[in-house]
Amino acid sequence: MPSTDQDDQLRELIPRLRRFALWLTRDAHAADDLVQSALERALSRWSSRRDDASLRSWLFTILYRRFLDGKRSAKRYAWLLGRLQEPDEPHWPSAEREFTARATLEAFGRLSDEQRSLLLLVAVEGFSYREVADLLDVPIGTVMSRLSRARQALRQLSDGEIPVPSLRLMKK
């Protein structure tokens, strides 16, 4: 079982796990179930956890693999983008920004699960390429090429509404 310090770290990671699960499942109830399932798996396998492993990476790996397992076994994963929720802000600064944001969200929703997961892990959750490679159990070069293809697909799906960056930033 986790120590008090690890228990605190675990509690701090729950909102991030839920956010990632929500993007994967596109359903709040399914996301909660997925997080609960991942935490149950983590706690039941706590003694087999390597001490030098990052708790964050370990939990995200478990969550992602539980998602894939559930998807395979259920054979009925269907996501709906149908309606975009209104932002919490009362209004956007410009119509152009709102249009770009909606186009990006719609395009993001049409990406494959693999592409969406990669973009979420790197761009939203802040994982390094190395951490994502370890999490998905693939070489770092594979992560980089898949991420590049995911970004290109996102630009294509948004009908050119997402600008191509002139300078590419590389993460360590």
Regions found by a protein language model. Name each.
Residues 33-40, 53-65:
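Structural recognition of an alpha-helix C-terminal capping motif at a helix-to-coil junction
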Residues 27, 128, 137-142:
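Helix-turn-helix DNA-binding motif, specifically the short coil turn and the N-cap/start of the second
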Residues 48-50, 61-82, 96-97, 156:
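Arg/Lys-rich amphipathic alpha helix in sigma70-family domain 2
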Residues 15, 45-61, 140:
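Short, aromatic/basic-enriched loop-to-helix "N-cap" motif that marks the start
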